[in-house]
Amino acid sequence: MTHSTARRMALRGLTVAALASSSLLSVAHADTPAVLRVSAIPDEAPTELQRKFKPLGEYLSQATGMKVVFTPVSDYAAVVESLATKKLDLAWLGGFTYVQAKIRTHGTAIPIVQRAEDAVFTSQFITADPNIRTLADLKGKTFAFGAPSSTSGSLMPRYFLLKDGLNPEKDFKTVAYSGAHDATVAFVAAGKAEAGVLNTSVWDKLVESKKVDTSKVRVFATTPPYFDYNWTVRGDLDPAIIKKLTDAFLALDPAKPEHKAIMDLQRASKFIPTKSSNYDGTETAAKSAGLLK
């Protein structure tokens, strides 16, 4: 072997080593999975969540070039934990579950987009009791929240009740947790609770689909607006994938029939960028309610 040949081989080896090292560094700083793993807080029945996500999942698969797999979970905490332990790449979270995910991931979870509606979200207090007309009438009544970790079915309504001088545990006869927004309506309709609270989006959907008899169950109060749902990614996901996902959501246009079908299922007029600081008020409310230290 001549000196020049040996030198060329050595240089080639150094180049390969450098490329391999560069590749390993990239992997260390950004995870690029072959499959995009997605889930959502179970604020509705699992079958309904899967039905709503299917067209969106197909759209995101086209946008990212990745296989998209949606896996329903049993409770809110499971979504937060799965995001923190890197078993999920993208998750549909409520405002409070985002705050929990931020804390659990030491600030690395990134909220990327929300529906325009989520920037001015509200909850509806409902009843089938003709004697309940105002929040003050809830004293001594049985009441149902949604899931304990639900932003719109528990945390924010509780926060506004406390601001109005009503402490659910002290002022209501009993407090129950239905587990989901649609279940809260069922509780009130069946007389399991004299009143309850759920988010406006689910209430409107149930009314439009005639799954609630508004001659029996009605809204008697509405909360002030607050930030709620968002799509959040784990912080060490490949930035290129995060950008593709963000761009895909922001590109959804209701003027395009194929996009409108997706957006209607998501109950979104459009998607807008969001940021962690939008949920500072939610974190404050959670601390005020004793749900966070």
Question: Could you describe each region identified by the protein language model?
Answer:
Residues 81-137:
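Acidic, polar ligand-binding/catalytic clefts
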Residues 33-39, 44-61, 226-228, 232-293:
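An extracytoplasmic/periplasmic, membrane-proximal ligand-sensing/linker region
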Residues 77-91, 104-105, 136-139, 180-201:
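Short helices/loops that flank or line small-molecule/ion binding pockets
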Residues 31-96:
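Extracytoplasmic small-molecule ligand-binding "clamshell" domains
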